[in-house]
């Protein structure tokens, strides 16, 4: 039975072209793939770590391990060494890599889910709403089975504002705001945040705004979960359990 449930991790696979000359891209644009060895047609979650697009590293959340699906943990370039939209483009290229390669590992192309926490949630959301990023790498954002961003910003990310020298805390809604790119026809979208009284400032409300805007334009594929009792960091574990359950039930 042990062999049946064996999982393997392949680390530090480059998801950029072999002809890439940018040394920072060569260094950061790598992913780990954790997958069931003796299973075919499994689902895959692409996971973007948090850290404000200024820090953090790829990891496989423990609640997503040994669940019968693969997890692809992605590193992407960080600010201030790289500037917007570098990290969004990296996220898009990583998802496109999964579409091109997951079948080699035994995974299903039509069961690729995109998720992440905090900055990773923002990256998931901007890919879901603005199709141009994945299109640049030959992938269709709407071919993703579902997006499940955890505690992501739906306005323009605070690190992008910081790069522009703008004051903290005052929202900007421009082309880098997922809410500004809201569309009627998208892949299913499961928004998850911590408790509105414990979360980062306006984080729940931003997600509630995106849900309301999507519904107002006729999008029928959006759901919002507020995980009561959990703050911005603590929500990761329970959110991952919700994500694992969603992926396993997905038809």
Where are these regions (language model features)?
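Alpha/beta-hydrolase active-site loop
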Residues: 82-103, 126
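The feature captures the conserved acid-bearing segment of alpha/beta-hydrolase catalytic domains
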Residues: 138-160, 168-212, 216
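C-terminal catalytic histidine-bearing segment of alpha/beta-hydrolase fold enzymes
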Residues: 208, 215-251
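The conserved beta1-alpha1 loop
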Residues: 48-50, 98, 193
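Short amphipathic alpha-helix adjacent to the substrate-entry channel of hydrolases
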Residues: 57-74
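N-terminal cap/lid segment of alpha/beta-hydrolase-fold proteins
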Residues: 3-40
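Primarily recognizes the serine-hydrolase "nucleophile elbow" in alpha/beta-hydrolase
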Residues: 13, 99-163, 174, 178
């Amino acid at each position: 039975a042990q062999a049946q449930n064996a999982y393997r991790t392949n680390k530090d696979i480059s998801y950029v072209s072999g002809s890439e000359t940018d040394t920072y891209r060569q260094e950061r644009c790598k992913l780990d793939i954790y997958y069931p060895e003796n299973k075919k047609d499994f689902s895959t979650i692409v996971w973007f770590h948090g850290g404000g697009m200024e820090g953090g590293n790829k990891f496989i959340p423990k609640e997503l391990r040994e669940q019968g699906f693969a997890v692809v943990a992605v590193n992407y370039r960080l600010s201030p060494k790289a500037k917007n939209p570098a990290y969004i483009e990296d996220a898009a290229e990583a998802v496109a890599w999964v579409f091109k390669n997951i079948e080699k590992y035994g995974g299903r192309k039509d069961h690729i889910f995109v998720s992440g926490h905090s900055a990773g949630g923002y990256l998931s959301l901007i890919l879901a709403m603005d199709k141009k990023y994945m299109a640049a790498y030959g992938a269709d954002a709407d071919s993703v089975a579902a997006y499940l961003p955890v505690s992501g910003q739906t306005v323009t990310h605070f690190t992008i504002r910081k790069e522009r020298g703008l004051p903290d805390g005052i929202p900007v809604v421009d082309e880098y705001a997922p809410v500004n790119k809201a569309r009627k026809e998208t892949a299913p979208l499961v928004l998850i945040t911590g408790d509105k009284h414990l979360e980062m400032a306006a984080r729940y409300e931003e997600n509630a705004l995106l849900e309301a805007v999507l519904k107002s334009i006729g999008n029928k594929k959006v759901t919002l979960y507020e995980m009561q009792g959990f703050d911005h960091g603590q929500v990761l574990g329970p959110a991952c359990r919700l994500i694992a359950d969603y992926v396993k039930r997905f038809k």
